[in-house]
């Protein structure tokens, strides 16, 4: 049973069906990013996919599309999935499109940005591709701004 300050309590519909059950990722680190297909930072999909491939036994990358910043994720689920697969070879889980901001902020983003809920820190998502790192028990251990290179940001947290 996941504790209240663990991301393992969340299960979100997948972009193209099924569920992304964070509880199924127990024992692995989880890197969550709010993503967008029409953003200047969209090429980070490539780096996120490289992390997923390099550390597949100890890390799960999860992309959560959002249209909160500049309307840069206007597509349908099928359009987003096709774009990510065709352009970046994305194989990591993508959830349905969610909101990162109030008043419609999704519960998972409430958890990731509230110290009261995650036990570590309050945080504000200011743009697409903000990244959150959670440990093997689902506890938040780090947050990286949108401009942080995912691979460089993760170096200190992953085995050499």
Which residues are covered by each model-predicted region?
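N-terminal "domain-start" segment that seeds a small globular fold
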Residues: 1-23, 43, 106-107
